[in-house]
Amino acid sequence: MMDPYATTHRRLKQIQGHFMTPQSLRVLPQFTLNSLNNKSNISSMWRKLTTSSRIGAVSIPPLTAYYIFKLFKGKHRKFINDKDIEIIIKEISGNDIFDQVVKLASKVIGFLGVIQISNRMETHLGVKLTFSKSYQLLVTLSSILDTILSFTKLTQKWGIIFCIVSILYCIINIRMLYLTLAHNKTVERLLSVTRTKCQGFKMNIPALGAWGSVVAITFYIWLKEAKKLAQSTGGILTMTAFLLSAIAAIRVGLRAAMTSFPGLTPFEGSSAVVIAIILGALPLIPYYTTSEWSRTLLSGYLSIVISMIINSFFAWKTPSML
């Protein structure tokens, strides 16, 4: 018969090994929570960001101001009446060189973050429930669809570059899905008896309230625009890929708020994904008033960003023994 204490102890070591450096495993100190003041917390988070994430984070405020300025400057821009989703998405995504650079930067930052997540996953394969299987499955499917779409855009400006990045994303996501499904299956079954002792189960009311408010706003906008959106044609792969990634992120945010435990870690990787999503969504802002699709996508990105911020917050906090 398995010793419950030994199993729980091993589980705690696995969790701590995932969140800490390999060197800390030799000492195995007691779990503590990051409970400093707000200024110290922000400073601690900033130090844990990768260099690319810091550059992206610093760029967000001026870029947001720039795109909001473009929104007001072009408020009399003609409304987009085209019914083809692919044409609409191309029109509202920003087509000048600066927009392309911003989108490419978001892809690169996100990719570097995903590599962080993948490397940590491979190092600590036995960390049960640290990575959400449903999230990884949905994101992988979305990545595959994005890659297929990128091949249809090779003739466009920057098409080859974005295609290469999409392929790299797809490969790393498939690898992570394999690690999540194949390697963790046996360990999950072995350690299932310790789930309530080692996984967070305390609901975080502020996080849940923020998540619920933003998701409610998103669904309100989607329902409000549903009639116009239904008149659009084509773009099935594009919207399916977006919805899969949105559902994955929103679910991770809900799970983190309900359990006070992240569904996507480490913080360095999760925060990079948040920054990448924000940067990628910014070029849509100037077209908020000219297309229902811009409003739909931006509201969706809002829910994704808030959900991932909630997840990243709990990924930053050191897990505690419950």
UniProtKB/Swiss-Prot annotation:
It is a multi-pass membrane protein. Keywords: Membrane, Transmembrane, Transmembrane helix. The chain crosses the membrane at residues 159-179, 203-223, 234-254, 267-287, 296-316. It is found in: Membrane. Coiled coil: none annotated. The keyword Phosphoprotein does not apply. GO terms for cellular component: membrane. This is Uncharacterized transmembrane protein DDB_G0287441. It comes from Dictyostelium discoideum.
